[in-house]
Amino acid sequence: MTEFETIKNAFARVRADLEIYEFENIGSKSIYIPAGDGEIELEFDGDGKLIDTNYLHD
């Protein structure tokens, strides 16, 4: 199981009420998790390894 799958499944189990969504771009995937007045982005490479995190807000 890749880091991407592990983290995605963990959030789904712990916070099933959150609307977690994913976006696939050329060569990478991101998971977006609501947090405060923004969201946390977890970016993974093509092999499912976590490569970057960001807090996005208006």
Predicted regions and their residues:
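Detector for the mature cores of small, proteolytically processed
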Residues: 27-58
